[in-house]
Amino acid sequence: SSVEVIDELYKSETATNFNNKSIAWLLKNYSRIYDDPDMALDLYTRQCSIGVTARQLAVAAATIAFDGVNPVTKQTVFKPDLGTRIASMMATVGFYEHTGDWLFNTGLPAKTGVGGGIMGVVPGVMGVAAFAPPLDDAGNSVKAQAALSDIVGRLNLNIFHPRKSILAEQA
């Protein structure tokens, strides 16, 4: 299935992404962006504004959880070592300034999006996703956080808890 840029979201993000613009030019100053920073920022903003369904987001999360193997098509779409790298990045920066609290409370590596989506990864087990506005002060969906937190709790998916998940018990 295809994905498209949500024009309204793209325009909204473009009108308010002053911090990202500053970061792009700072990266250019330190030779970490090798081309036009405004062009790089526009590309980044467009990819942040792509519309997907909850199912598409969950399949993407599961692909990360299964080290690059899409669970629907069974195709390998990226190198296996990238799954761990991506999940680690999600665990450390996926919720912006709320990342530490989120990870402590849920134990779920996750990434939020400005459209109200959140995708979470339980390495080797599953991917999960939820969509729901409104966003909190850090730009994270309030209701999607509650939904994923509930799922993690009910299924014992916290990656820091040594007990088995009920999913593992059913296998």
Question: Where do the protein language model's features map onto the residues?
Answer:
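Structured C-terminal helix/loop/strand segments within mature extracytoplasmic catalytic/sensor domains
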Residues: 66-171
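Surface-exposed loop/turn and secondary-structure junction residues enriched for glycine/proline
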Residues: 30, 36, 44-48, 53-55, ...
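Glycine-rich, acidic and aromatic/proline-enriched surface loops and short helix-turn segments
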Residues: 25-32, 63-66, 92-95
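Active-site-adjacent helix/loop patches that line small-molecule binding or acyl-intermediate pockets
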Residues: 1-47
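Conserved active-site and cofactor/substrate-binding residues in soluble primary-metabolism enzymes
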Residues: 18, 22, 35, 39, ...
